[in-house]
UniProtKB/Swiss-Prot annotation:
WD repeats lie at residues 23-66, 67-114, 115-161, 162-203, 204-265, 266-309, 310-343. It is linked to Neuropathy, hereditary sensory and autonomic, 9, with developmental delay: A form of hereditary sensory and autonomic neuropathy, a genetically and clinically heterogeneous group of disorders characterized by degeneration of dorsal root and autonomic ganglion cells, and by sensory and/or autonomic abnormalities. HSAN9 is characterized by global developmental delay and intellectual disability, axial and appendicular hypotonia, dysarthria, and an abnormal gait that is often described as ataxic. Other features may include peripheral neuropathy, hyporeflexia, and autonomic dysfunction. PANTHER family: RUBY-EYE2-LIKE PROTEIN, TECTONIN BETA-PROPELLER REPEAT-CONTAINING PROTEIN 2. The keyword Repeat applies. This is Tectonin beta-propeller repeat-containing protein 2. Gene3D superfamilies: YVTN repeat-like/Quinoprotein amine dehydrogenase (2.130.10.10). Residues 400-420 have a biased composition (Low complexity). Keywords: Autophagy, Hereditary spastic paraplegia, Neurodegeneration, Neuropathy, Repeat, WD repeat. TECPR repeats lie at residues 945-976, 994-1027, 1179-1209, 1226-1259, 1279-1310, 1322-1353. One of its GO terms (biological process) is protein exit from endoplasmic reticulum. It comes from Homo sapiens. Interacts with the ATG8 family members GABARAP, GABARAPL1, GABARAPL2, MAP1LC3B and MAP1LC3C. Residues 475-489, 496-542, 608-621, 763-779 have a biased composition (Polar residues).
Length: 1411
């Protein structure tokens, strides 16, 4: 323990947003939304372990800044206690409310350590809630106690994978605390404290005096190196007394602490919060001690109960500090100098003598003024990031308009914990905000759309030195995890202070891909929560002795959090020796396979072309992800959907071009020499597709007085979700070569990485912005190396379905409408807000009050509102955002209005429909004419002489004969397509590009195309479904609860549990007509906008892929034929694919995939054989029967279904029974009943007189006991092998090359559980146990595991994929289905890209929007 000479103050330095944001507040289970409560806590120097009410254990690695998740299989039950142990292997034990105890042996990247997550279960002895756990120091013994007094001893043999448990002691009352040392177990119960000698199995009570009252009084050993006979302990007693006793239970001293408490207890300083932690504090109960632990220095004892925490000094018999009357303290844990406690449902607070992550030496170094030497930080513990007291705020003005932060999401399967704010602890520090404390609303910096459209000339800037700002009291350091700190504006040369176009929102720069917030291997539920908010911004720091802090509590890129430094410097900067870490974050990831650079200290002087930028590479250490749900903090987990500016690849293949070398340890360019773009890919070419340079964050990387370096960090980082997207903030990627510019207009940068959407270059913008000051330019030759064939990789589907999230203006959103330039939101309280589009972020302005419905015309010229209570419709005279507005009464008794650019369609309270025509800016309303309608309507939408309506029964109608000459049209027609698909829309809207959009009651989004006035029903004979459920959770009950809260109409509902109220109201919302129809969908030329009814909405600004599963009936078969199996293979005859179909295990037929409706050919099976599995390639069909026999049918052009079956001689394999087969092009893979994997070259059964090809046995992946491989899946080109195990975990074989066709190692692929896989030549598709389908993105030769999963619409019972990624499936009723897709793009320009081999840069221009 530390010996302390001067007095120390214990306080909370900064809230643990990085930890709390990584744990979802709710999960979705089916239709139910379950609140996640935190229930248990334990900490040490390496990890923070948090138990939850859903049976999920969250483990945060403090060195890697990664959150992992582990769960108990079976029913979800609350975790009541967790206990960490760091010995040779890291272990964590958790106990639940039903008496289950599980031990997880964690994966370590260090050599010789555990490489596979393992779990041991203690079951069958405890039947009641676990209350205490204790480890032996070597991790071989675990003691667990429950609330009925049972104590179980579990012996762990980690090498053998064994865990044996036995009951060793039973007390009459609940166990309160356990501690173990030197073969002695210290037990505290509600009635007494005792010592249990584990060798002699004898018990001795501590002290002879019985307790005067029962209670949760604990005891702990006093740490120290000593033999058993010298052990001493503290035990708390009623009446503020503490015993010190020896190993025989004899009391050596009694500390009576009443006098120490008489003068009061100095409270711990807590970080200021919006709601004080003591809000809801209880009246102070009688003081008493509780559980105890030794802490900080000799003689100091930490004691706590559910109301209070006390830090006591037994030497001086005094209280050091404490927290009293707070109430609801659930769990307390301490490390050497930190106290963590869990309060209430989800508040974890850290109390310490110093900020998180700073060792005292680093702290002292930071405080030295004028220190010009670079601080060498080489260990992970040294500096996860500078904290508050070390951060000086530089910069100038702060604008004070509220901005809502975009948080991007993209479709992916992994909707777990998505937007976790995983920052290194230090990076969470709140910068001190100048003089005086400002209200939160003023701590925002936003840009108006006018600013955003200005030209931005980028130059390196010198920042004037300013004196350190003194720390101010109170709120200046307080921050709330949903707020944004202000961005300092840098002054431009010439002293004209201009705001850099850095909307704070951009800080949360959207990660538009899919978080690989992976579901853990056994995760029973998909947790969907999105908490990432921005906590701050980079501060420009000019003092050489201080560190810059980039503070973002959205999911921060691992790049900033945990990796080694790529160096870069802007031109025109003097070179200097002293250098500091850009973000103050430098983590040494010890021993991990890819991150070797961390092991060598960086030279202090790297030549003029280097500046440090941390950057993260995918950790590909084998087994590093096995069975664990690792959520890297940032891009590696949030794989984007959109190319970063100029090809930012974050996963393992960090490549710019086909010739790029992978940036692995050691492949570093010579220090100081310029690096060709093909060698280093992390270059941000700053540009924006909508016609101006993207916003740049200027990070000052300070030198000593000789100069100042500036690095523009573009925030267009994409990524996102896992279903929930994680915002990656200001991903500071850059290159050795000092340049930052746009590529030539006629080139598009692409990458050899086919699937990784990081790898695609963004076409350059049409901006005329000068780039002359940006330094040396990239030559044409560099770009011309990029092969034209790679341009075809810019397929829209890779960038499709990238959703960004925005915060709404206040309360839940009832209605959302968009025009060309503005978005309008109506909340449940009747507040109407608007914000300009598509600036860097949304700046909400209150427009009106007491509004029930709002409508706007597509151009934005017309704006109508319907008033609350009076139901009168008003038209706005001239739509101005600022200044006075005049409203004209347009029609009384209205409930819903839809506006086209020159008409208004009004549904009235009577259900009648009225029309006003000839409207314009000068004539916003006119005389109303009644239009007959056969059904009462609830919604209507009109645009470009097309009118669609939604009836109260959720049927869709369209109006025929509408034209500019006949605006009222001729007649209503029912939409047959919607009836056929049984679509039940909640709201509909007409969008640009002649589209119609609908949101249904299940939260699915659909569209139709070709909607024009002459053909209002459109071109499609079905709706196309767009995948949104991974980011937008339509929680009807929360939608209705929002209405309740807003209108205060159910005052007594709160007395019942929220879930019950929600259940009662769930149907009420969708079945009864609300006073106003929620309108949750809007489409304009900048994107598709959706609200889920909460105070948030989502926008897809790129293309969207619509899916339709087409029911195919081969000729000669009945439409009701129930197929059981479908398999696609390369056709023996010509280009294209064959489908092999069967209805049972005793039949088989084949048909060409190109003409699947033609008559199938029947294939005769071997007599008496019951087939269990098939695999096929171009020249052979392999079949496996129920006895494990293999039959081969040779296929040829002349006989595409083959002539006869040949039984394969399997005598070489002995008694092995094969259960799964996979055919590549020339290679065969098989799996046996015990999980063994076999490889064979050649698809044909050779003549038995010749040498038979040998089966080579491949060692399967290391698995926990009882888990084995069950199926193998190979790609048609022999390049990939993926396997599934008996727990539905997915693994990939790495290292497969032409020279090494069997590969070299196995890697667990986290993110989802799959019961079937199908491989094309480029990627992998998976079917989940519930029938959902997902695609793996980012699979390449260099990155065989890919990056993230992304779900597609549909639910199937069996599926297959052709070599070219066309999906075929058997649907739930047994129908044969073919997946058809249609891409919706916002501009005609994007559609040209699929026709040209080398698309012009502007073709994809509107795909991207800088947020």
């Amino acid at each position: 323990m530390a010996s302390i000479s001067e007095p120390v103050t214990f306080r909370e330095f900064c809230p643990l947003y990085y930890l709390l944001n990584a744990i979802p507040t709710k999960i979705q289970k089916g239709f139910r939304s379950i609140v996640v409560y935190l229930t248990a806590l334990d900490t040490n120097g390496d990890y923070i372990a948090v138990g939850s009410s859903i049976g999920m254990l969250y483990l945060y690695c403090r060195h890697l800044n990664q959150m992992r998740k582990y769960n108990f299989e079976g029913k979800t039950e609350s975790i009541t206690v967790v206990k960490l142990l760091s010995c040779f292997d890291d272990l964590v034990a958790a106990g639940t409310a039903s008496g289950r105890v599980a031990v997880f042996q964690l994966v370590s990247s260090l050599p010789g350590r555990n490489k596979q997550l393992r779990r041991f279960d203690v079951t069958g002895i405890h039947k009641n809630s676990i209350t205490a756990l204790a480890w032996s120091p070597n991790g071989m013994k675990l003691f667990s106690g429950d609330d009925k007094g049972k104590i179980v001893y579990s012996s762990l043999d980690l090498d053998q994978g064994l865990c044996n448990s036995q009951l060793v002691l039973e007390e009459p009352s609940s166990i309160v605390q356990l501690d173990y040392s030197q073969k002695v177990l210290l037990v505290s119960t509600l009635q007494r404290s005792l010592l249990f000698y584990t060798e002699e199995k004898s018990v001795r009570q501590i002290g002879t005096q019985p307790r005067k009252s029962t209670g949760k009084f604990g005891a702990c050993f006093i740490p120290g190196l000593c033999k058993q006979s010298d052990l001493t302990l503290y035990a708390s007693r009623p009446g503020l007394r503490l015993w010190k006793a020896d190993v025989h239970g004899t009391v050596q001293a009694t500390f009576i602490l009443k006098d120490a408490f008489a003068g009061g207890v100095k409270p711990f300083e807590l970080h200021p919060r919006l709601e004080s932690p003591n809000s809801g504090s209880c009246s102070l109960p009688e003081r008493h001690l509780g559980l105890v632990s030794c802490f900080f220095q000799e003689g100091w004892v930490l004691s706590w109960n559910e109301y209070s925490i006390y830090l006591l000094d037994t030497v001086n018999q005094a209280t050091v500090a404490g927290l009293e009357g707070s109430g609801d303290i659930v769990s307390v844990s301490c490390t050497e100098n930190e106290i963590f406690f869990l309060k209430g449902d989800r508040n974890i607070i850290r109390i310490s003598s110093r900020p998180e992550g700073l060792t005292s030496t680093v702290r002292d170094g930071l405080e030295m003024s004028g220190c010009s030497e670079r601080v060498h930080v080489q260990q992970a513990e040294k500096l996860p990031g500078a904290t508050v007291s070390e951060t000086r705020l530089r910069g100038s003005s702060m604008a004070s308009s509220v901005a809502s932060e975009p948080r991007s999401r993209s479709s992916s399967l992994n909707s777990t914990d998505s937007g976790s704010g995983l920052l290194p602890p230090g990076l969470q520090a709140t910068p001190e905000l100048g003089k005086g404390s400002q209200p939160l609303s003023q701590r925002f910096n936003a840009i108006s759309s006018e600013d955003f459209d200005q030209e931005l000339v980028v130059k390196p800037i010198k920042v004037k030195r300013k004196k350190k700002k003194k720390k101010t009291e109170g709120g200046s350091r307080s921050t709330c995890h949903s707020s944004l700190e202000s961005t300092p504006c840098s002054e431009f040369p010439g002293d004209s202070p201009q705001s850099l176009n850095t909307d704070l929102l951009s800080m949360t720069s959207s990660v538009l891909g899919s978080s690989v917030d992976q579901l853990s291997a056994e995760s029973p539920d998909q947790e969907s929560s999105f908490n990432g908010e921005v906590n701050g911004v980079p501060q420009e720091n000019t003092d050489p002795e201080t560190f810059n802090v980039l503070e973002v509590s959205g999911s921060m890129p691992d790049s900033l959090a945990e990796e080694d430094d790529i160096r870069t410097e802007m031109p025109h900067c003097h070179h200097a020796h002293g250098r500091e870490l850009l973000n103050g974050a430098r983590e040494d990831v010890g021993g991990s396979d890819v991150t070797g650079l961390g092991d060598e200290p960086c030279p202090a002087d790297d030549g003029p072309n280097s500046t440090q930028l941390p950057f993260q590479e995918q950790d590909s250490s084998p087994g590093a992800h096995d069975g664990e749900d690792i959520q890297p903090i940032g891009p590696q987990s949030t794989f984007c959907e959109v190319p970063l500016l100029n090809s930012l690849t974050v996963p393992s293949s960090l490549s710019w071009a086909p010739s790029a070398e992978q940036w692995l340890p050691g492949t570093r360019a010579d220090e100081g020499s310029p690096v060709e773009p093909s060698q280093e890919q992390d270059i941000l070419t700053s540009m924006e597709a909508s016609g101006h340079l993207s916003t740049n964050l200027w990070h000052a990387v300070t030198d000593d007085d000789t100069g100042q370096k500036e690095i523009p960090i573009s925030e267009r980082v994409l990524g996102s979700v896992g279903g929930q997207l994680t915002p990656v903030s200001a991903l500071a990627a850059s290159t050795h070569k000092p340049w930052l510019e746009q590529p030539p207009r006629d080139q598009t940068l692409t990458s050899s990485d086919e699937e990784d959407i990081y790898a695609h270059g963004l076409p350059s913008s049409s901006s005329e912005t000068s780039v002359t000051e940006l330094g040396p330019s990239c030559s044409q030759q560099d770009l011309s190396r990029l092969g034209a064939e790679d341009a075809g990789l810019l397929k829209p589907d890779q960038f499709a379905e990238s959703w960004m999230g925005y915060s709404g203006p206040g309360y839940g959103i009832l209605s959302l409408v968009v025009s060309e330039k503005y978005i309008w939101c109506l909340d449940y309280k009747g507040g109407l807000f608007c914000s300009a589009l598509p600036g860097a972020g949304l700046r909400w302005q209150k427009f009106e009050d007491a509004v029930q419905q709002v409508a706007v015309s597509p151009s934005g010229a017309l704006l109508w509102k319907i008033e609350q209570k009076s139901n009168r419709a008003f038209a706005c005279g001239k739509v101005t955002i600022k200044g006075k507005r005049h409203w004209y009464e347009a029609l009384p008794q209205a409930v819903f209005v839809a506006l086209s650019d020159d008409t208004a369609w009004i549904i009235r309270t009577s259900g009648d429909l009225y029309l006003q025509t000839g409207l314009s800016v000068d004539r916003p309303c006119a005389r109303a004419v009644k239009v007959d309608c056969p059904y009462p309507l609830s919604q209507i939408t009109a645009r470009n002489n097309v009118v669609w309506a939604l009836t109260e029964q959720r049927a869709l109608l369209y109006r025929e004969g509408v034209s500019s000459f006949c605006p009222e049209g001729e007649q209503w027609k029912c939409d047959i397509v919607s009836e056929r698909q049984a679509l039940e829309p909640v709201c509909i809207t007409l969008g640009d590009q002649q589209t119609l959009w609908a949101l249904d009651i299940h939260g699915n989004l659909w569209f139709r195309t070709g909607i024009i006035s002459k053909k209002p029903q459109g071109d499609d004979d079905h709706w196309w479904q767009v995948s949104i459920t991974d980011y937008v959770v339509f929680d009807q009950c929360s939608l209705f609860q929002t209405i309740i809260h807003a209108t205060h109409s159910v005052a007594t509902a709160a007395q019942a549990p929220v879930e019950k109220v929600a259940d009662k109201l769930r149907m009420a919302f969708w079945s009864q007509q609300l006073q106003c129809q929620p309108s949750l969908l809007g489409v304009n030329n900048s994107g598709v906008w959706i609200s889920s009814g909460k105070n948030e909405f989502h926008v897809a600004k790129g293309s969207l892929i619509g899916t339709y599963w087409n029911h195919v009936v081969p000729r000669g078969t009945a439409s009701a034929t129930k197929w059981a199996f479908v398999l696609a293979s390369a056709a023996p005859t010509k280009e294209g694919s064959f489908l092999w179909l069967c209805q049972s295990s005793k039949d088989l037929c084949s048909v060409s995939a190109q003409s699947a409706q033609s008559r199938p050919s029947t294939v005769q099976l071997p007599p008496e054989a019951e087939m269990r599995a098939y695999a096929a390639c171009q020249d052979a069909l392999w079949a496996l029967d129920s006895l494990g026999q293999v039959f081969i049918r040779t296929l040829s052009k002349s006989c595409p279904t083959g002539m006869h079956w040949t039984r394969l001689d399997l005598s070489q394999l002995g008694a092995v029974k094969l259960t799964s087969l996979a055919c590549g092009n020339q290679h065969i893979w098989a799996c046996d009943s015990r999980g063994g994997v076999y490889f064979r070259v050649g698809t044909q059964p050779l003549n038995p007189s010749l040498m038979l090809p040998a089966w080579i046995m491949i060692e399967p992946p290391v698995q926990p006991a009882g888990v084995s491989l069950v199926s193998v899946h190979s790609s048609p080109n022999d390049q990939m092998l993926w396997v599934l195990d008996s727990r539905w975990n997915v693994h990939v074989r790495t290292g497969i090359t032409e020279e090494m066709p069997v590969g070299t190692a196995w890697e667990h692929v986290p993110g989802l559980q799959a019961c079937q896989l199908a491989l094309s030549t480029r990627t992998v598709w998976a079917r989940c146990p519930n029938g959902d389908l997902a695609r793996r993105y980012g699979v390449t030769d260099k990155n065989p595991a890919g990056d993230y999963w992304k779900k597609i619409p549909g639910s199937v019972s069996c599926f297959t994929v052709t070599a070219s990624d066309e999906l075929w499936a058997v649907g739930p009723p047994g129908y044969l289905l073919q997946r058809l897709t249609k891409t919706f793009s916002h501009s005609h320009g994007t559609q040209k890209s699929s026709q040209a081999a080398m698309p012009h840069p502007e073709d994809l221009e509107d795909e991207w929007e800088v947020i």
